[in-house]
């Protein structure tokens, strides 16, 4: 008997051990990412030819303790390598595992290589050559917890490479993953009608058809690792190949199982057909180009096993949630009596199906950990309301009903108001309901959802489910394309969080506000370039700017400066520490045709600039951060602690009768009025003048003050 190790991705061990037992292996022992077993040479060949789940089969030559480089060298040197391969054959070493004295897999591979070369030399035999690519004889070494296992890569190239795949589509499933899905779903025990409405390049269906036809998965492979092994018995191997070919021929003629595959991408369907033809099962599978939501149920019962699309790019998550929700509706309405098995890396997408799983498993798709859920659709289940009908029929989805009703009500009111007001970007919802802690802003034909950090006492699973429900419900509630919804997660403002990049890609739009035009960037940063709650404050700045010298401090993208310029300011100076936002402010001026020299831009630490400038102004607008400890500032800044010092430092910049419009977003901010009055400031709160209708539901979003200094 020979000792083997069947390697497989983590999570496949159980199914692999069952497969090995069915094939006749003995002394089966599950390990991490594989299974040890014993078998005769003939059975080792058979397992290599017939295993659908293993990644590779390793013939174990040595296994023992290893605590030092010397022990590793001695273990490899002690093997009679001339019994394993000829010196004329090239060899390579795949070393796996680290720990202890092994801090680099290359080090382990070199030690074994040195031992092999030295052993050949000491046995008076020419040394074999190392080949990094396509070696004749591949040695596999695995180090774990003080144990070294050295063996021959018996199977050769990865076993999931069956030989029938011509090219791959996007994110193709590996063949052994598809086989594992078929085993764990229960379909393999009783092959019945099988369909995959997201078939891609056809892997699940092809693997299933090969199972139903009793076709060995290795039958189309051209190369195996044992071919250059000295103890290889080609007669036995050829006999197993002949047997497998005969079984496949008989199995195909007896196969009565129906297979149905479809995909919305015609190129992938064409590829799936080519792959199925290469595998010899094309005539068993009915392929079609179709949207999964439109496929017809091919019988009263069967299995639907699939890997629907999933992705993590912002801007696609809402569309995917809509797809999964609609799939759940279709399954419940049309697939009564069917078993479903769905693989996905995003449990929130699976939750959008609104189906209760009979079983939930973990299964790796390459390095990506996925959930593999099994469902039974009972025939008595009834269809729920389709969310796409909310607007058309006046119905409300059974998901997040209070949220849907509130958003619809808000949107109906604000849509008319915004058109009359002359703005096309506004807030629809701002955590109006405690269970749905999000802010929703509409920018022309797009919506940005910002998720606030939930309280620590709310389980993460609850907040995720609520957010999922928001994303499912919103498109139909306000009639927006799911592809035009952008999701962002943010905490309450902390320091410079709002200025950090979150994506490399951009989505730039031009919005209009009281005649002013501003550039928006909806994806690249947490904020979009326009603080919507300051809309009336900017308008006020414009109204007060006629024939005045205006200063905008902590200017961000210079939107208040644009209003000042359009309001007829004599001059406008825009100061911000960020080069990005200073350039953005310049773009906003250019959009409005404001190119005069009287409009100046300064990139500087505002605190330091105030100390050094000698300029004078009639109107200063200042909207400092709530808190900042930027590396480019010498000291931290806290608006509650430091606002008196900040405002007093502006006195020297004011012309006689000059005014300051001071705003901040600190909740529960308390203005030190007495201290400011002692500095000859007249202080007036103007929140009522500067809180737009779309922010009336959240009066603490900001506070705004008008200060006049008396000489």
UniProtKB/Swiss-Prot annotation:
Primary location: cytoplasm
Domain of life: Bacteria
Reactions this protein catalyses: guanosine(2445) in 23S rRNA + S-adenosyl-L-methionine = N(2)-methylguanosine(2445) in 23S rRNA + S-adenosyl-L-homocysteine + H(+); guanosine(2069) in 23S rRNA + S-adenosyl-L-methionine = N(2)-methylguanosine(2069) in 23S rRNA + S-adenosyl-L-homocysteine + H(+)
Keywords annotated in UniProt: Cytoplasm, Methyltransferase, RNA-binding, rRNA processing, S-adenosyl-L-methionine, Transferase
Any one Gene Ontology cellular component term annotated for this protein: cytoplasm
GO molecular function, one term: RNA binding
UniProt KW Phosphoprotein keyword: no
Pfam families: Methyltrans_SAM (PF10672), RlmL_1st (PF22020), THUMP (PF02926), UPF0020 (PF01170)
All copies of domain THUMP, residue ranges: 43-154
Stored Gene3D superfamilies: 3.30.2130.30, RNA methyltransferase domain (HRMD) like, Vaccinia Virus protein VP39
Cellular localisation: Cytoplasm
Annotated EC: 2.1.1.173, 2.1.1.264
UniProt xrefs under InterPro entries: 23SrRNA_methyltr_KL (IPR017244), DNA_methylase_N6_adenine_CS (IPR002052), RlmKL-like_Mtase (IPR000241), RlmKL-like_Mtase_CS (IPR053943), RlmL_1st (IPR054170), SAM-dep_methyl-trfase (IPR019614), SAM-dependent_MTases_sf (IPR029063), THUMP_dom (IPR004114)
Family per record: Belongs to the methyltransferase superfamily. RlmKL family.
Purpose of the protein: Specifically methylates the guanine in position 2445 (m2G2445) and the guanine in position 2069 (m7G2069) of 23S rRNA.
PANTHER family reported in the protein's UniProt record: RIBOSOMAL RNA LARGE SUBUNIT METHYLTRANSFERASE K/L, RIBOSOMAL RNA LARGE SUBUNIT METHYLTRANSFERASE K_L
NCBIfam families: PRK11783.1 (NF008748)
Protein name per Swiss-Prot or TrEMBL: Ribosomal RNA large subunit methyltransferase K/L
Organism encoding this protein: Shewanella sediminis (strain HAW-EB3)
């Amino acid at each position: 008997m020979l000792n083997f190790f069947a390697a497989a991705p983590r999570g496949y061990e159980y199914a692999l051990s069952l497969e090995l037992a069915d094939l006749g292996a003995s002394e089966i022992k599950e390990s991490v990412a594989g299974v040890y077993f014993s078998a005769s040479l003939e059975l080792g060949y058979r397992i290599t030819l017939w295993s659908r789940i293993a990644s590779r089969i390793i013939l174990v030559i040595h296994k023992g303790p290893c605590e030092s480089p010397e022990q590793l060298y001695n273990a490899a040197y002690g093997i009679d390598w001339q019994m394993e391969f000829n010196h004329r054959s090239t060899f390579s070493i795949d070393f796996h595992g680290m720990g202890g004295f092994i801090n680099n897999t290359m080090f382990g591979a070199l030690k074994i290589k040195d031992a092999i070369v030295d052993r050949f030399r000491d046995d008076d035999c020419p040394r074999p050559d190392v080949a990094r690519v396509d070696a004749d004889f591949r040695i596999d070494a695995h180090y774990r917890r003080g144990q070294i296992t050295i063996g021959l890569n018996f199977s050769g190239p990865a076993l999931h490479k069956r030989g029938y795949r011509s090219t791959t589509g996007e994110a193709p499933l590996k063949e052994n993953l598809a086989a594992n899905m078929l085993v764990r779903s229960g379909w393999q025990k009783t092959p019945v009608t099988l369909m995959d409405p997201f078939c891609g390049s056809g892997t699940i269906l092809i693997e299933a058809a090969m199972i139903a036809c009793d076709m060995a998965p290795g039958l189309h492979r051209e190369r195996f690792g044992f071919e250059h092994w000295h103890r290889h018995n080609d007669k036995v191997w050829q006999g197993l190949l002949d047997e497998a070919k005969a079984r496949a021929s008989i199995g195909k003629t007896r196969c009565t199982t129906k297979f149905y595959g479809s995909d919305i991408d015609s190129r992938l369907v064409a590829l799936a057909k080519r792959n199925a033809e290469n595998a010899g099962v094309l005539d068993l599978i009915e392929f079609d180009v179709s949207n999964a939501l439109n496929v017809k149920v091919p019988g009263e019962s069967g299995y639907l096993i699939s890997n629907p699309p999933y992705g993590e790019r912002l801007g696609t998550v809402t569309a995917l949630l809509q797809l999964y929700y609609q799939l759940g509706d279709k399954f419940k309405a049309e697939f009564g009596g069917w078993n479903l098995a769905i693989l996905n890396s995003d449990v929130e997408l699976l939750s959008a199906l609104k189906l209760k799983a009979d079983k939930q498993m973990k299964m790796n798709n390459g390095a990506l950990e996925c959930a593999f859920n099994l469902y039974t659709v009972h025939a008595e289940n009834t269809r729920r309301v389709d969310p796409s009908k909310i607007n058309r029929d006046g119905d409300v989805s059974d998901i997040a009903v209070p949220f849907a009703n509130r958003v619809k009500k808000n949107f109906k009111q604000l849509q008319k108001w915004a058109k009359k007001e002359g703005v096309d970007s506004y807030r629809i919802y701002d955590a109006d309901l405690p269970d749905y802690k999000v802010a929703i802003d509409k920018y022309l034909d797009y919506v940005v959802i910002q998720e606030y950090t939930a309280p620590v006492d709310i389980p993460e699973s609850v907040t995720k489910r609520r957010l999922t429900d928001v994303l499912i419900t919103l498109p139909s509630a306000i009639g927006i394309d799911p592809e035009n919804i952008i999701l962002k997660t943010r905490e309450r403002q902390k320091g410079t969080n709002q200025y950090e990049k979150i994506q490399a890609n951009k989505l730039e739009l031009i919005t209009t506000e009281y005649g002013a035009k501003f550039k928006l960037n909806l994806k690249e940063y947490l904020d979009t370039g326009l603080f919507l709650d300051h809309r009336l404050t900017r308008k006020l700045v414009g109204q007060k700017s006629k024939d005045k010298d205006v200063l905008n401090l902590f200017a961000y993208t210079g939107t208040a400066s644009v209003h000042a310029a359009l309001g007829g300011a004599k001059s406008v100076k825009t100061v911000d520490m960020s080069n990005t936002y200073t350039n953005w402010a310049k773009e906003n001026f250019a959009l409005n045709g404001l190119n005069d020299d009287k409009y100046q831009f300064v990139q500087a630490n505002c605190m330091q600039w105030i100390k050094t400038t000698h300029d004078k102004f009639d109107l200063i607008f200042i909207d400092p951060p709530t808190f900042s400890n930027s590396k480019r500032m010498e000291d931290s800044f806290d608006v509650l602690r430091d606002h008196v010092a900040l405002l007093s430092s502006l006195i020297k910049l004011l012309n006689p009768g000059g005014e300051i419009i001071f705003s901040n977003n600190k909740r529960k901010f308390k203005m030190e009025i007495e201290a400011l009055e002692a500095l000859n400031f007249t202080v007036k709160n103007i929140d009522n003048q500067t809180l737009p209708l779309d922010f009336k539901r959240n009066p603490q979003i900001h506070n705004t003050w008008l200060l006049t200094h008396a000489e």
